[in-house]
């Protein structure tokens, strides 16, 4: 018996006008997730997902490309305004933010949510290069 052709599921259009962009920028990669107000993911992208490998993932250009891709996906769902939460010490923070702004989003607030210890755990040893 021949099996039925599988149908390709299209992404549902969610029609959400405002949301939160979480920009997680580590030393190795930059990940951008756009969520609604409750935290449900609407669109996501990262430098690695856009085809950058190795040390190129940590560049500001890779973060910009990932942010543009994520913005395009979110705009398909009717997203217009964003609050931005930036986390991490990486080099892609500012360029991802600029790319989101250039994509046509109205950015209402920018928050830095990088966790900073109040002298908690002992840090790992310093690198000697």
Swiss-Prot record:
Annotated SUPFAM superfamilies: Translational machinery components
GO biological process: translation
Domain of life of the source: Bacteria
GO MF terms held by the record: rRNA binding; structural constituent of ribosome
GO cellular component, one term: ribonucleoprotein complex
Keywords carried by this UniProt record: Ribonucleoprotein, Ribosomal protein, RNA-binding, rRNA-binding
Cleaved signal peptide residues: none
NCBIfam families from the UniProt entry: PRK05309.1, uS11_bact
Family from the record: Belongs to the universal ribosomal protein uS11 family.
Protein name: Small ribosomal subunit protein uS11
Organism of derivation: Sinorhizobium fredii (strain NBRC 101917 / NGR234)
Gene: rpsK
